[in-house]
Amino acid sequence: GDVYKRQVWFDSGSTFQHVLRGSHKDAYDRAPFHDAGPEADLYLEGHDQHRGWFHSSLLLGCALYDRAPYKGLLTHGFATDGQGRKMSKSLGNVVAPQEITDKMGAEIVRLWVASTDYSGDLNIDDKILARVVDAYRRIRNTLRFLLANVSDFDPAQDAVSDADLLEIDRFALSRAAQMHADILAHFKVYEFHPVVSKLQIYCSEDLGAFYLDVLKDRLYTNAPKSLARRSAQTVLYRITHAMLRLMAPFLSFTAEEAWQAFGSSESIFMETYSDLGTPNEALLAKWTRIREIRDQVNKDIETLRADGKVGASLQASVNLQVGPEDHALLASLGNDLKFVFITSHIILEAGSEILAKVSVSQDTKCERCWHYAPDVGVVPATLALGVLAHRNLGKHFG
């Protein structure tokens, strides 16, 4: 009799017919597009499937329904060693996912995948994994700081309205909203490695190297229920909410672990993304410039530190000359300028360009607040006195 031949990819190419009209039939029947034929949201496989599963699915979909059986198609490369070579036992360069999981945990495997550009091959070796571990620790340590500093914060009773937030806190919220919008835009088009990169930079530079560093005085030395401290906690609480939701797709265990200590619902995976509002562009521009000037001053302070003349920036005294526009910008901070620059003394002067003269403070260090001041030893230093009396300390960002 006649011999019929069937292309070997026919079975897999018809999976949309079996899945969307079989095991997932109830969901398919409720979908508004079901009359036009089954259609998956996404087909995901390696780039070798352009001639295999993707191709046979497209042929069958067009033959049966005059269209592709998927809305989107995502292809990825293959895992190679650190030098981009194909893994083989003869080369001794095989990296087994289970071994990484046993040694470092599943989070590291997930983070490696998410942080790698999957449009090409995905390189992996011990050095690459060490960098992934370092990135994970940076994100986790940031979370630990955030959780610790909102542990006594009840949003129902303690939250400060947006209008009453201190300016630097409003800036931090705008920067978080900007980061949040950028990351969601990447998620929508399945770009995961920029998500990890931007979240890591946000944790290390925006939070660790600036905002959280500046906040420590306010969080640790202001009265517990003061406006200044509650303003900071309000923003930290909202940042934590947003970060956990953004992390959950690729740092699932970590996000869930933190959520169990922080969240109000059963699981982070029952939550939707946060709404941080629209970034304030004027505020972002102002504080971006302040941070640029601060970075330049910090370089001069680091020179003193490298020479062993100061141990911390609070031991430095700064005379700062800046141009007219920058002078107006920094002068608007008043006495808070020294807290932004994390120095015990800073004198602002008009000039034509940025010029910082950094010297060692001749005052005495307060053992409670660590600031250097002339009144240490006479009475408790001003900052420490505010703590002992459980009072607000004047302006200090509020």
Model-derived segments and their meaning:
Residues 59-64, 306-307, 374:
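Short beta-turn/strand-loop junction motif enriched in small, turn-promoting residues
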Residues 1-41, 45, 162-179, 311, ...:
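Cys/His-rich finger/ribbon microdomains and the adjacent scaffold used
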Residues 1-152, 172-215, 234-248, 365-368:
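Structured secondary-structure scaffolds
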Residues 60-64, 261, 392:
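Active-site catalytic microenvironments for nucleophilic, acid-base chemistry
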Residues 11, 69, 74, 264, ...:
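A generic structural signal for well-ordered coil/turn residues at beta-strand boundaries
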Residues 153-185, 212-324, 347-357, 383-384:
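Acidic, turn-prone loop/beta-hairpin segments
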Residues 143, 150, 294-297, 304-308, ...:
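Conserved NTP-handling cores and scaffolds of large molecular machines
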